[in-house]
Amino acid sequence: EVLEDGQPQKIETFKRISVTGTPTGGGEPAREIRSEYVEEAEAAREDVRMFVIFLDDYHVRRGASMAVREPLIRFLQNDLGPLDMVAIMYPLTPVSVVRFSRNRDILAGAINNFLGRKNEYEPRNDLEQQYANYPTETVERIRNQVSLSALKGLVTRLGGMREGRKSVIVVSEGYTYYLPPELRNSQAGISTPGQNGVSSVTGNDPNEFRARMML
């Protein structure tokens, strides 16, 4: 039985689709994605799974980002098939330039470069320079907005690529407006004593060594 808004719907056609990321007998082989045209054509196939790994560097501590690299690369190497398409995105990545790939070496290299910046406020681009003199609490709100807006844009783009399921893997420690007193500063771009631009909240904090992966 299929319901829509609580009302039963008539089933006119039914098709079972089992997708494993591996070509079936007689199926088309995986094509190397070298252009947007090939990307769109491959994404339209029913036997292709699509994944986006969203590396939320604004909300992952440096140590946690290093710890999560290995399990992400294992996922690429062991859990994906040759047909699967994967893209990597950061909060500041324009959704228009997000590209999918089947090259596991390139994807693994990108993951190995992932470095979290949670509680680090040194500006690295013109956008961040604009609010470098804001209080750290304000910067955290801006970072939340940037990250969530990027996810919304990503979901919109994925929805326009084809019907069916797409998966977004969000690597983040979560969103919060709270900062411990030692990280509060009237100017985010100026390091507090003992920080030198890097969060001094390490030690036994378990979040320093763990990032949540949310599907």
Give the positions of each predicted feature.
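Scaffold/interface architecture of coatomer-like assemblies
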Residues: 1-215
